Swiss-Prot record:
Chain sites annotated for binding substrate: 94-97, 247
Binding of heme, residues: 361
Superkingdom of the organism of origin: Bacteria
Catalytic activity entry: 4-methoxybenzoate + AH2 + O2 = 4-hydroxybenzoate + formaldehyde + A + H2O
GO cellular component: cytoplasm
Gene for this chain: cyp199a2
Full protein name: Cytochrome p450 CYP199A2
Family note: Belongs to the cytochrome P450 family.
Subcellular location: Cytoplasm
Subunit structure: Interacts with the ferredoxin-like iron-sulfur protein ThcC.
Amino acid sequence: MTTAPSLVPVTTPSQHGAGVPHLGIDPFALDYFADPYPEQETLREAGPVVYLDKWNVYGVARYAEVYAVLNDPLTFCSSRGVGLSDFKKEKPWRPPSLILEADPPAHTRTRAVLSKVLSPATMKRLRDGFAAAADAKIDELLARGGNIDAIADLAEAYPLSVFPDAMGLKQEGRENLLPYAGLVFNAFGPPNELRQSAIERSAPHQAYVAEQCQRPNLAPGGFGACIHAFSDTGEITPEEAPLLVRSLLSAGLDTTVNGIAAAVYCLARFPDEFARLRADPSLARNAFEEAVRFESPVQTFFRTTTRDVELAGATIGEGEKVLMFLGSANRDPRRWDDPDRYDITRKTSGHVGFGSGVHMCVGQLVARLEGEVVLAALARKVAAIEIAGPLKRRFNNTLRGLESLPIQLTPA
């Protein structure tokens, strides 16, 4: 078990990175994205708090410090941006999120609305339909011979077949949803090629999303219409409602797509674990959780200090960016036994793949439901999952995911 790091206010601000190890690692470089694990180990072993000279930010890569930062939103705020850009110094590229880029108490009010829309009762109501759609998708893929691209044909196709309907979106234009989510997560990074090219290509995706978030374009009974209904009760304003719909459009899809992709990739690489899942399909939920821990589709997020603070013995001044390495925390041997092993019976509670604290991923219940029913369908209907060709990574400043993963599904 890890012990909580000390977190105390200090009266004298520090110079940038004074008293902590300075590292030349660039966590936004393509070679880092290709294989982040060696450098994540370097980050963890260097100390509980480090300074990354490339981008002039502090970094925390061990579980204890990542957890501490996530769970102290008053000291480590989100309203100045959860990417490298500091909204106090730079204009945001879009109107800030009322969920992701907000702090309590404002965040508490808007988050409460989404929590009501995406309640456990709502997930229970959706479960049978989502499970039937997962069964139908696996049947369809097996009927095609089982030689598929796990990303386009399953990890993307399944969520796109159920989530937009649950949101109440029109059929036309749904192809904009994934590029928009990719744009949002690239924009959290530095002004590199990934960020710049995503923003340059973003006009049609942004226009589509802005239009879909308006009340007249959302079908009655869907998540979007339910969000707008809260503006009638005064819990949110009519101006806030479209921004909350926008938050759900990205949070409810990208986490699911990358989580399912991670899980299928893990089960293909570790056939013994897939055999355990086939023997006990009730492990589907935990197999999905373990894949989110193991692969950590959301790798990083930033916070900004609201005051001078001491974290694990390191003094950090007010207004400093702190980069949290979620993926590294999820493989920290100080917290996890044998962290580099995918184990579908592991006690995964506490992983930070969906964040932690008040800003825990708003789409997590949707992602978990979809992930569980897809893996349960695979467990019942498929005897083997084998990698059938070279994979291709999809590079993103925040997300770790795959562009393509050829696999062969053998029917049970």
